[in-house]
């Protein structure tokens, strides 16, 4: 980009072999800790549309994205099934008109809405577009941010911490992921478990999401051996309950918990490679559900 780049600007960002993808320039001080840790000099942070990931890039490598370009791309590629995800990203960019609303939706998606409200309260106003994208965190903001992650990751966490420990039927299985020889026996036990807890599937899905997110994403230091082990156990439990005649993690559970978006974020983090194979298998088993959720999201977007 040749012009002075600012937060809230729509841009095209190319990553590796992927086609240029619609994104918005994001304020550094509002980034998640795991993203901010990867901060690069002379780079700005962008947040992709229709994708949970962020990327650090030099402004000179970003291309300005205007509404005419968005309209023309959608018109030209809307019927191309091979570019459905990219077209959906352009559609989200087309409906982008209020940076603060975008931030609220993003923070809610990442279960950090309380953090955004804390930022705005400390600054005395809503976060708006047009800021310098190179400005990082101050020590005061960073300290408060660290405390909000370690003490109050989710508004419901403190209320449910004791409750979580008293739920033996939610506690992750000690069994490893089923193998070809033991799969039948393992699945039989899981079917009974799903039947018993099916009415609480949304609550349990949210619990799984919070635990995995706390272990791997919302943290300042590398996960401990215990947290890695617990995450493997949780993912195995999800895997075991994702391929049944009556899926435990159904459309309602994923819609409310956004567990699939968390797994996508893990897959997109190269530092979490040991979890990638299982996350990919789970996401593959949820492919139809994820497609349905995307359709719901598109239908909810305002028509031009």
UniProtKB/Swiss-Prot annotation:
Keywords, sorted A to Z: Cytoplasm, Nucleus
- Which Gene Ontology BP terms does the record give? positive regulation of transcription elongation by RNA polymerase II
Induction comment from the UniProt entry of this chain: During S phase of cell cycle.
Q: Entry's CDD domains? A: PWWP_ScIOC4-like
**Which GO MF terms does the UniProt record name?**
chromatin binding; RNA polymerase II complex binding
Q: By its UniProt entry, which Pfam families does this protein fall under?
A: PWWP
Question: Coiled coil where?
Answer: none
Q: Which InterPro entries match?
A: IOC4-like_PWWP, PWWP_dom
User: What ranges does the record list as Basic and acidic residues composition bias?
Assistant: 151-168
Which Gene3D superfamilies does the UniProt entry name for this protein?
2.30.30.140
**Statement: the UniProt record of this protein carries the keyword Nucleus:** yes
Which regions span the lipid bilayer? none
Where does it mainly reside?
A: nucleus
Tell where it localizes: Nucleus; Cytoplasm
Q: Quote the cellular component terms of the Gene Ontology held in the record.
A: cytosol; NuA3 histone acetyltransferase complex; NuA3b histone acetyltransferase complex; nucleus
Keyword Nucleus part of the UniProt annotation: yes
Chain spans, region Disordered: 145-195
Q: What else is known?
A: Present with 2610 molecules/cell in log phase SD medium.
Report the protein's function.
Histone-binding component of the NuA3b histone acetyltransferase complex. Targets the NuA3b HAT complex via histone H3K36me3 to the coding regions of actively transcribed genes to coordinate transcription elongation. Stimulates elongation by RNA polymerase II in vitro.
* Subunit field text: Component of the NuA3 histone acetyltransferase (HAT) complex. The NuA3 HAT complex has 2 functionally distinct forms that participate in transcription. The NuA3a HAT complex is composed of at least NTO1, SAS3, TAF14, YNG1 and EAF6. The NuA3b HAT complex contains an additional subunit, PDP3.
UniProt remark on domains: The PWWP domain mediates the binding to H3K36me3.
Q: What is this protein called?
A: NuA3 HAT complex component PDP3
The protein's organism comes out as Saccharomyces cerevisiae (strain ATCC 204508 / S288c)
Q: Which gene is transcribed and translated to give this protein?
A: PDP3
């Amino acid at each position: 980009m040749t012009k002075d780049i600012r937060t809230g600007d729509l841009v095209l960002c190319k990553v590796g072999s992927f086609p240029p993808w619609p994104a918005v320039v994001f304020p550094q001080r509002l980034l998640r800790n795991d993203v901010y840790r990867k901060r690069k000099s002379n780079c700005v942070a962008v947040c992709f549309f229709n994708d949970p990931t962020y990327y650090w890039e030099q402004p000179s490598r970003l291309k300005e994205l205007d509404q005419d370009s968005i309209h023309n791309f959608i018109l030209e590629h809307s019927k191309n099934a091979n570019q459905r995800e990219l077209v959906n990203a352009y559609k989200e960019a087309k409906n982008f008109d209020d940076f603060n609303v975008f931030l609220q939706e993003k923070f809610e998606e990442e279960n950090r809405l309380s953090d955004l409200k804390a930022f705005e309260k400390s600054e005395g106003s809503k976060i708006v577009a047009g800021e310098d994208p190179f400005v990082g965190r101050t020590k005061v903001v960073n300290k408060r941010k660290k405390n909000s992650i370690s003490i109050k990751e989710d508004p419901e966490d403190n209320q449910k911490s004791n409750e979580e420990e008293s739920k033996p039927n939610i506690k992750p299985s000690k069994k490893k992921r089923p193998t070809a020889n033991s799969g039948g026996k393992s699945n039989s036990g899981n079917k009974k478990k799903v039947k018993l807890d099916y009415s609480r599937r949304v609550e349990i899905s949210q619990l799984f999401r919070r635990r995995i997110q706390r272990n791997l994403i919302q943290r300042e230091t590398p996960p401990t051996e215990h947290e890695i082990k617990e995450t493997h156990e949780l993912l195995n439990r999800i895997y075991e309950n994702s391929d049944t005649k009556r899926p435990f993690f159904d459309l309602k559970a994923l819609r409310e918990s956004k567990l699939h978006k968390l797994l996508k974020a893990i897959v997109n983090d190269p530092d979490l490679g040991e979890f990638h194979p299982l996350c990919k298998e789970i996401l593959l088993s949820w492919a139809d559900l994820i497609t349905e959720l995307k359709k719901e999201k598109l239908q909810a977007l305002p028509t031009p």
